[in-house]
Regions:
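Short beta-strand segments enriched in small/hydrophobic residues
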Residues: 23-38
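Short, solvent-exposed loop/turn segments at secondary-structure boundaries
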Residues: 39-43
Length: 167
């Protein structure tokens, strides 16, 4: 999956074409699961999903699919292999949110669809009063996990961090 560029040169009346590929990892961030939450809490979970998509989409070294794709995949209950085949997704990010009073827990996992395994699972506890701060932090944390811990090509991973910090 990627973009293709063709360079042509005229060498002794022969055209020589060189295929160069550039490939960006493709991410799909599934809507945060909200079973058992109030309508207001479901709105917060949707906001977390949208914020992660927005934050990661601004980073040019990866391609993040739209929220409409995420919500469609959830609504149609697409399986991981169908998501990979239909959209070329490399990494799938899923999560769930639990709320008790003013305290919340967000569980996230990153699945490498090529390897067909969960490569990272983490939880984040926070106070609902800090929901916007949490939304802002999550995209950066996911980016760091993808580039450093998952080593999406170790050289590529460190390039991602450098490019991200220079934005």
């Amino acid at each position: 999956v990627g973009m293709f560029y063709f360079n042509t040169s005229n060498d002794s009346d022969k055209q020589v074409a060189t295929l160069q590929t550039t490939s960006k990892p493709i991410l799909l961030i599934m809507p945060i699961k909200t079973s058992g939450l109030t309508d207001d809490q479901k709105g917060f979970a949707r906001g977390i999903t949208e914020s992660m998509i927005s934050t990661l989409s601004s980073y040019q070294a990866i391609k993040v699919l739209s929220s409409s794709t995420s919500f469609h995949a959830q609504k149609t209950e697409m399986l991981d292999n169908a998501i990979r085949e239909n959209y070329g997704v490399d990494y799938l990010i899923r999560g769930s949110m639990q709320v008790m009073g003013n305290n919340a827990r967000l569980n996230l996992e990153i699945t490498d669809l090529k390897a067909a395994k969960v490569t990272l699972s983490k939880k984040k506890d926070f106070n609902m009063e800090n929901i916007f701060k949490v939304q802002d932090e999550l995209g950066n944390e996911i980016l760091n996990e993808l580039s450093i811990n998952l080593g999406v090509g170790s050289a590529q991973g460190s390039d991602w961090v450098k490019q991200w910090k220079s934005m």
